[in-house]
Amino acid sequence: MPALTVVESDVNFYDEKEIKVTVRISDYIHGVTQSALARWANLTPWELVSDAPERVRELLRQLSDEHYQVSGDIAVHRTAQVEDGAILKGPLIIGPDCFIAAGAYLRGGCWLDEHCIIGPGAELKSSFVFAGSKLAHFNFVGDSVLGAGVNLEAGSLIANYRNERADKTVNVRVGDGLVSTGCEKFGALLGDGARLGANAVVAPGGLLRPGTVIRRLALYDCEEV
């Protein structure tokens, strides 16, 4: 295993401004600037998800009752299908032609673009999911941003918390070093068309470029690359 590189020195330290330029959601998700999230396209993904409930509430205020069935802080597009037994907790927006299966659990401020699928037993927490992405079944995705056409096979997980160590702060890999996000809860940013095989795990802080494939049963941990 290669030696862990932690960015601490003045030479290798990436300041906040450089991080925002280097880790842009728009570099991973092509359609973000034309989406409802366009105003936040220049945020880092951890900035976006760290305030997910309020951001979803802001989007809720702009929706039309003509197209969405709104109940409290939950909005479901009239073309979406939500099966009996799904658990929905607001704030939450479910977009056009989405399918939410029985046993799915959505909570903590989530936004789903069009044609998304959240399968049986899948849990989505404080996350933003772009068009055509699918959580097959028995998945967990926490505090994450998934690009368009992302697919998670059965049992694949995106972890959002470093419970294995005393310092819970999540790091991301930028260039040849690690950068602290300053957050204790951040899962991953998955670019358009990324794929996670069955029972694969992405550790907190993953930044997966468009088209990345993580094989079945594999662990991707940016701190061990």
Predicted regions and their residues:
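Short hydrophobic/aromatic-rich motifs at helix boundaries and adjacent loops
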Residues: Y68-Q69, G85-I87, G119-G121, C183
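Glycine-rich hexapeptide-repeat left-handed beta-helix
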Residues: T5-V11, V129-V225
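Terminal amphipathic alpha-helical/low-complexity segments used for targeting or macromolecular assembly
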Residues: M1-D73, R78, G206, P210-G211, ...
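A generic local structural motif
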Residues: Y68, A86, A104, G175-D176, ...
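Short secondary-structure boundary/capping elements
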Residues: G108, C116-G119, G182, F186
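Conserved short-loop catalytic and cofactor-binding motifs
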Residues: A36, A86, A104, F138, ...
